[in-house]
């Protein structure tokens, strides 16, 4: 900004020339025109003692000079003159202005406001029933600078529906259209500014802060808004207090010291200070004097650029200062404009021409800015000069400039102006102008602004940081905010080159949630999330359970998908059972092969011949049924498992039952009866018994499948990390009834052979059958408690094992001994050993008798 730098030097040179010389700056604060705009600017301030000692409603002297207020007033002058010199907005018309000093005091501001509301051509306000045709001295008012003053003037001007456009008042309450129907502003409301502040705190993880506000409407409302926004974002306010305005009384001093003590006790490193410049001046004065440890101060816009605060001695001791200022367009010619008018103020000829015009308002109001006419270099802070030279005050200057253009645009719309002229029928009244300002858009340099329904404009913010390059700070832009915060970390200066930490408790590790201690949510212990839950967000207070189809280990930040679990073919237990299947199936096939090879031998014939082979085939099918249990279950496999296992077993046990019945008959009945019954047990009737038993078992299986069909179930509760898919048995009682046929056959076999006495010199067939049935019962009786206690995932493996062990037991106890005789004891493979002498004789007699009868018949 070279032009602004030149302006700063020119201003300094002018002020040096102005030492001891009388200037005429105050006389430049009024200009005539077709329409007059009022202006309220903080050109000075008063001593607090003067207000305390005031006992009569007389004038209040403004003893201090405010350079910033002077620059803002000159920005309004420049905007008015720019509009008058152009033809884009008000061709053929001139705007005038009447600027007054608010002295930063409500009492002084009220007096100026009353002068604006006085009837044109007079200095008084008359009482009327209807003010519709009332013509005040000014058409609209620019200002004031502070929300405290705007709350007062806003109600004054709203009664007359006079448009008021503030360039700095940002209280959110001023957006209330019922109370302030004629109030507008060219800055965003404090709510937007505080949203930016909360975003800044979140960005640096500053969740343990103090919040202080000035003891006035501005500070109290700001604290209220900040508190609600901070709570919604998980930021804890360790201490919240109000700072009294600057006062030398002992009572006020005690309040300030109490605020400082409580901030120290809260052990915060960041303080949000939403206060007026006077309150901040009071707080920082005592903070520096009493040696408060440096903090990070997040400033409100009202004091971030205040020369009252920036020129405080030893201000650098307070620490780091950050704050947001609304962004505006640059006005590069403003430096030249200020330089020119300051030079004119020192020109005696120019001042003499102004003195020739009598200012009637000065008889009532007094001189507009007494301190402006005798300012000297020491009246202007070096920090303000540096910031102005660097273009750091352009946001406030532009806001004033834009406020003037908003009124000019509204007047342009009201008068229906075009590029050549305006339709001037009669003088425009303030309420007529106001009608055209609602939701109006207007141009100010490169920006297009628009008033919303609440009279606010939407503008971006610049994040400013105080940088100590001299006894007073200089503002540096270190970020922007337009709904999202963008920081320039390389431009930020921190003590020790480390970002301060302001947290009550450390950040929890991954997979941990917060358990609050006390009243503040930011003070907490970290608790691990248990298995099956996870931490969804870093600020969570409870662990979030995983979905049904997910799982998580302890201290998780996310859930993992559950893998399906079933008895897979590749599992070791399945592979072991498949090896056992091969063994049992191999033995059954070997026994079947030997039986077929020795089909005519007494051993095979005594064992039932075809029934013996049929039993071996059924035993093999019984073993093969285990192949239905491994793998991912399906509806078909679940339905087929029990029938495919029990029907072959019924066929096998029915043949063994016939063997047991024949053994019992031969041993316990007379020979004639025994021979007669044995002929039936070895003929067609024997197959009818097998068919009947199989039919009964098939009927039971059909009833089981129809009444209680097993189904594929997805079980989420059995395994912590997997989802179990298995065949669900809907009724264990019905499944037990499916076993009833086989159990009855086995019991009858055991009963028929256990009591039979063996005959000397004969093969003890009853012993093999007894042990075979014992193997059956031991297997399935052991199966019940084992199945009840094993995990559901491995219940199919238990059923597979029971089937194979049962088949192996029958093979080992009944079939393999016969194979042993066929292979290694062929001398015992005789009719006498397997059938006995009586049986052989009876067989021969039956054979001879049959032949004689046949010959007789022939």
From Swiss-Prot:
Reported effect, residue 261 to C: In strain: FVB/N, ST/bJ, SWR/J
Tissue occurrence: Expressed in circumvallate, foliate and fungiform taste papillae as well as in taste buds on the palate. Also expressed in testis. Not expressed in brain, heart, kidney, liver or spleen. The topographic distribution in various taste papillae is different from those of other T1R members.
Membrane-protein topology: Multi-pass membrane protein
GO cellular component, one term: Golgi apparatus
Highest rank taxon of the organism: Eukaryota
Glycosylation sites: 58, 85, 130, 203, 264, 379, 387, 418, 439, 482
SUPFAM superfamilies membership: Periplasmic binding protein-like I (SSF53822)
Signal peptide: 1-20
Extracellular membrane side: 21-572, 632-644, 709-735, 789-796
PROSITE patterns: G_PROTEIN_RECEP_F3_2, G_PROTEIN_RECEP_F3_4
All ranges on the Cytoplasmic side of the membrane: 594-610, 666-687, 757-767, 818-858
Phenotypic consequence of residue 706 to T: In strain: 129/J, 129/SvEv, AKR/J, BALB/c, C3H/HeJ, DBA/2J, DBA/2J, FVB/N, ST/bJ and SWR/J
Main location as per UniProt: membrane
Purpose: Putative taste receptor. TAS1R1/TAS1R3 responds to the umami taste stimulus (the taste of monosodium glutamate) and also to most of the 20 standard L-amino acids, but not to their D-enantiomers or other compounds. TAS1R2/TAS1R3 recognizes diverse natural and synthetic sweeteners. TAS1R3 is essential for the recognition and response to the disaccharide trehalose. Sequence differences within and between species can significantly influence the selectivity and specificity of taste responses.
Protein name: Taste receptor type 1 member 3
Organism of derivation: Mus musculus (Mouse)
Taxonomic lineage from the root: Eukaryota, Metazoa, Chordata, Craniata, Vertebrata
């Amino acid at each position: 900004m070279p032009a602004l730098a030149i302006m700063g030097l020119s201003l300094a040179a002018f002020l040096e020339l102005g030492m001891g010389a009388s200037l005429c700056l105050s006389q430049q604060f009024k200009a005539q025109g077709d329409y007059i705009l009022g202006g309220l600017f903080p050109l000075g301030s008063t001593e607090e003692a003067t207000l305390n000692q005031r006992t009569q409603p007389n004038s209040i002297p403004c003893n201090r000079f405010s350079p910033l207020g002077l620059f803002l007033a000159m920005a309004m002058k420049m905007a008015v003159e720019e509009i008058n010199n152009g033809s884009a907005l008000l061709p053929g018309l001139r705007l005038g202005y009447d600027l007054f000093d608010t002295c930063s005091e409500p009492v002084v501001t009220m007096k100026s406001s009353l002068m604006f509301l006085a009837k044109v051509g007079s200095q008084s306000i008359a009482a009327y029933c209807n003010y519709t045709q009332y013509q005040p001295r000014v058409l609209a008012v620019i200002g004031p600078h502070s929300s405290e003053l705007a709350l007062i003037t806003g109600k004054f001007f709203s009664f007359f529906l006079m448009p008021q456009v503030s360039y700095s008042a940002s209280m959110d309450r001023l957006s209330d259209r019922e109370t302030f129907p004629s109030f507008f502003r060219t800055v965003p409301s404090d709510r937007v500014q505080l949203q930016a502040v909360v975003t800044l705190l979140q960005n640096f993880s500053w969740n343990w802060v103090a919040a202080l506000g000035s003891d006035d409407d501005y500070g109290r409302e700001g604290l209220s808004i900040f508190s609600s926004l901070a709570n919604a974002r998980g930021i804890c306010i360790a201490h919240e207090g109000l700072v009294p305005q600057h006062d030398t009384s002992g009572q006020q001093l005690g309040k300030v010291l109490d605020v400082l003590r409580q901030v120290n006790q809260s052990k915060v490193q960041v303080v949000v200070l939403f206060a007026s410049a006077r309150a901040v001046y009071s707080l920082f004065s005592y903070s520096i004097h009493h040696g408060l440890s440096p903090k990070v101060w997040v400033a409100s816009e009202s004091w971030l650029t205040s020369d009252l605060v920036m020129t405080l001695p030893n201000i650098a001791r307070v620490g780091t200062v950050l704050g947001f200022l609304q962004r505006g367009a640059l006005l590069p010619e403003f430096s030249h404009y200020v330089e020119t008018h300051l030079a004119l103020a020192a020109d005696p000829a120019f001042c003499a021409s102004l003195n020739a015009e009598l200012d009637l308002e000065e008889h009532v109001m007094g001189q507009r800015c007494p301190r402006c006419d005798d300012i000297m270099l020491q009246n202007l802070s070096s920090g303000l000069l540096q910031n102005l030279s660097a273009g750091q005050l352009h946001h406030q200057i532009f806001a004033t400039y834009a406020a003037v253009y908003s009124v000019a645009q509204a007047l342009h719309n009201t008068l229906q102006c075009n590029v050549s002229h305006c339709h001037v029928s009669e003088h425009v009244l303030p309420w007529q102008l106001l009608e055209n300002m609602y939701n109006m858009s207007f141009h100010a340099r490169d920006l297009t602004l628009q008033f919303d329904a609440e009279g606010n404009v939407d503008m971006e913010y610049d994040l400013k940081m105080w940088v100590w390059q001299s006894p007073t700070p200089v503002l540096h832009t270190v970020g922007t905010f337009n709904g999202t915060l963008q920081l320039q970390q390389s431009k930020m200066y921190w003590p020790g080159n480390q970002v301060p930490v302001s947290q009550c408790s450390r950040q929890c590790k991954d997979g941990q949630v917060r358990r609050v201690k006390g009243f503040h949510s930011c003070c907490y212990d970290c608790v691990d999330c248990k298995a099956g839950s996870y931490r969804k967000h870093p600020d969570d207070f409870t662990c979030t359970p995983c979905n049904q189809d997910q799982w998580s280990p302890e201290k998780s930040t996310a859930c993992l998908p559950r893998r399906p679990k079933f008895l897979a073919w590749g599992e070791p237990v399945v592979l072991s059972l498949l090896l056992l299947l091969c063994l049992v199936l191999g033995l059954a096939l070997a026994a079947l092969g030997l039986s077929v090879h020795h089909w005519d031998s007494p051993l095979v014939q005594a064992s039932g011949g075809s029934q013996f082979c049929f039993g071996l085939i059924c035993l093999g099918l019984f073993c093969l049924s285990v192949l239905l249990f491994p793998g991912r279950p399906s509806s078909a496999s679940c339905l087929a498992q029990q029938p495919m296992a029990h029907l072959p077993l019924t066929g096998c046990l029915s043949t063994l039952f016939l063997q047991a019945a024949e053994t019992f008959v031969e041993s316990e009945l007379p020979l004639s009866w025994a021979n007669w019954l044995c002929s039936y047990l070895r003929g067609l009737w024997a197959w009818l018994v097998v068919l009947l038993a199989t039919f009964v078992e098939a009927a039971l299986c059909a009833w089981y499948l129809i009444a209680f069909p097993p189904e594929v179930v997805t079980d989420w509760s059995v395994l912590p990390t997997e989802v179990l898919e298995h065949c669900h048995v809907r009724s264990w009682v019905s499944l037990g009834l499916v076993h009833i046929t086989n159990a009855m056959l086995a019991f009858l076999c055991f009963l028929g052979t256990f009591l039979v006495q063996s005959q000397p010199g004969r093969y003890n067939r009853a012993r093999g059958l007894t042990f075979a049935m014992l193997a059956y019962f031991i297997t399935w009786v052991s199966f019940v408690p084992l199945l009840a206690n094993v995990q559901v995932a491995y219940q199919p493996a238990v059923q597979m094992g029971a089937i194979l062990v049962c088949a192996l037991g029958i093979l080992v106890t009944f079939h393999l001994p016969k194979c042993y005789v066929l292979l290694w004891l062929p001398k015992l493979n005789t009719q006498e050993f397997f059938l006995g002498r009586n049986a052989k004789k009876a067989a021969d007699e039956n054979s001879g008798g049959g032949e004689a009868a046949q010959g007789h018949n022939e």
